A protein has these predicted regions:
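A conserved beta-strand/loop capping segment in the N-terminal third of enzymes
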Residues: 1-55
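Active-site/ligand-binding neighborhood in enzyme catalytic cores
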Residues: 32-34, 41-110
Length: 110
């Protein structure tokens, strides 16, 4: 059981003992494990960067491949927001599985 509401936690603990739970989602891309949501651990593993400024610079570099082009599909929209590496490794497969379509066939507004 998981809640951040102390009143609810106190209430349910009247009836049973619960273990502490920490939600730590990860993504598995070709056997490589990445933290989700994205954080400095994710960026360090992707690019070896150690500061937020370095991570931001890498993302900006990758975002710029589209130039001033207006995104025409979900893939282009995602790349324009988070760059190619994060999109390819952590977003594309999940999105295509969820929607049952290639990201290039999905509208940019999703």
């Amino acid at each position: 059981f998981h809640t951040s509401n102390k009143k609810i936690w106190d209430y349910v603990n009247q009836f049973a003992d619960f273990n502490r739970y920490t939600n730590s989602p990860v993504a598995n891309y070709n056997g490589e494990i990445y933290n989700l949501p994205f954080n400095m651990n994710t960026f360090n593993k992707l690019w070896g960067v150690v500061t937020p400024a370095e991570a931001q610079a890498k993302i900006e570099e990758q975002r710029s491949i589209l130039g001033d082009k207006r995104p025409e599909n979900l893939e282009e929209q995602a790349i324009s927001l988070i760059g190619t590496d994060i999109y390819e490794k952590l977003i594309k497969g999940y999105t295509e599985k969820q929607w049952g379509h290639k990201a290039t066939d999905l509208p940019a507004f999703i």
